[in-house]
Amino acid sequence: KGIVGKSHSRQYDLTFAQRLNWRQTYGQHNIDLMIGHEYFKNRNYYLSGSKSNMSSQGNKELDGAINVQSTGSYQSEYNTESWMARAMYDYADRYFAYGSIMRQGSSAFHPDHRWGTFWSASAGWMLSKENWFNAKWVDELKLKASYGENGNDQGMRYSYYYTGRYGISNSNGNIALTPSTTKGNEELTWEKNSKF
């Protein structure tokens, strides 16, 4: 007489960030320093169930059916943590230097491979502000060289968790453990992207 199913999911995110900035000017020397820390947590909950043999097609609640078809629930958690530092310097708005470093951890990876270090640096020269630059048809001309790295853990969440995992099923009223057919990889770590 029909099947009725219900599901419910809930998610929350928490971000906890701190920054400490210091800026100072000495004549034409400008210095800007920053250190910071950030923690992020994502947690998901999911619950579902279905029953058959409905008492009425107008009653779409689980209480309106008598035979349990399936039930299920799970929860997942994902965390990242970052420590960072950055320094910026310029002289007379003509010569520029920048450097940053970040130490980043992710629960997507095995504890032995959880942390990665990423850095970036750049230098610039504003030629159009030099006294000898007299090309009036150029408003601004700047030379810049930079290199940077960043890490990516998306698409790899929980991949290593499948190592040594078992599924639980019902075998004639008894608990049966079945080895997971999905193999995890404890060696996975951050994907590092570099850009010049």
Predicted regions mapped to residue ranges:
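Extracellular/periplasmic, surface-exposed regions of secreted and cell-surface proteins
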Residues: K1-F196
